[in-house]
């Protein structure tokens, strides 16, 4: 099923939530838990304002960008669920900053 929120609106929500992280000029491993938490809660709050007809699940992955002369850092993530394919679904959105990429997985489950 397609997302119950327009894809452009969903992209705006994710970009706005990720902006503070994307503005970072360097990756600070000591702050990643706090950064992830702030992004997730910002997305969840915005989604709940848009519609309360769904339960929302948001996961966030922060990926450190490395210098061009350094080999690319590999990251792999996977999600699976059992649900009603006509009413429930998921999507992934990636936002890129100078030092960090933010990958958000958003799942919706009808109530």
Curated annotation (Swiss-Prot):
Cytoplasm as UniProt keyword: yes
Gene3D superfamilies associated with the record: Tctex-1
Cell compartments where the protein resides: Cytoplasm, Cytoskeleton
Cellular compartments per GO CC: cortical microtubule cytoskeleton; cytoplasm; cytoplasmic dynein complex; cytosol; horsetail-astral microtubule array; meiotic spindle pole body; microtubule; mitotic spindle pole body
Example GO biological process: karyogamy involved in conjugation with cellular fusion
CDD domains in the record: DLC-like_SpDlc1-like
Disulfide pairings: none
Pfam families from the UniProt entry: Tctex-1
Major subcellular site: cytoplasm
Family: Belongs to the dynein light chain Tctex-type family.
Name of the featured protein: Dynein light chain Tctex-type
Organism: Schizosaccharomyces pombe (strain 972 / ATCC 24843)
